Amino acid sequence: MEPTASGIFCNRMLSMVNSEDVNAIIQAQRHMLDRFEKTNEMLINFNGLSNVRLQQMNEHFLMHTRTLIEMKKDLDSIFRRIRALKGKVAKQYPEAFSNVSESSNLEDDDDEFDPIPASVATITTTATSEQSTESCDTSPDVISPTISCCSEDPSQEHTDTPTSDSHEQPVLRDEGPDSADI
């Protein structure tokens, strides 16, 4: 039989393709497929670990957020108590409290030069059972920087706390987040 044109064309096309090259290409594709499968498996493991870690961090974040919210509520409560105590002191000793308010306004003008006036730094006050029986106030708006707030009995005061025999009134300032300037 005489070869047909299509048969000749097919034979020449087949003879142009080198079987070694085809086998090398197939081998390279199998190698790449193995690498892609391993990479895919590693990425799946990484995603799983990342999701677990994200859940852990989310729980920690929520816990810390709740802690911050509770701390803010506690601080708001503390500042409310301080304002109530200031109001009580203002009602019990209106003359002294008005003098303190006037002197604090004058001292606010001098704060540029002396951040803590010497008269305020040497005043010592002790907390009484009328003021608080719950806990010590360690907030930044303490009446005086030298106050021993945990001491309810004067005999239990710290000996390193400076005292003064002067009859000056302590400066009461409310620096809480909800306070208005006096």
Swiss-Prot record:
Q: Which Pfam families match?
A: KxDL
Q: How does it assemble?
A: Associates with the BLOC-1 complex.
| Chief location bin | membrane
Role noted for this protein: As part of a BORC-like complex may play a role in lysosomes movement and localization at the cell periphery. Associated with the cytosolic face of lysosomes, this complex may couple lysosomes to microtubule plus-end-directed kinesin motor. May also be involved in the biogenesis of lysosome-related organelles such as melanosomes.
What's in the keyword line of the UniProt record? Answer: Lysosome, Membrane
Q: Could you tell me where the Low complexity compositional bias lies?
A: 124-135
Q: Which GO terms describe its biological process?
A: lysosome localization; vesicle-mediated transport
**A GO-annotated cellular component:** BORC complex
Record family assignment: Belongs to the KXD1 family.
Q: Which domain of life is it from?
A: Eukaryota
Specify the protein name. KxDL motif-containing protein 1
Q: Quick one: where's region Disordered?
A: 124-182
Record InterPro entries: KXD1-like, KxDL_dom
Per the record, where are the segments of Basic and acidic residues compositional bias?
155-176
**Species:** Danio rerio
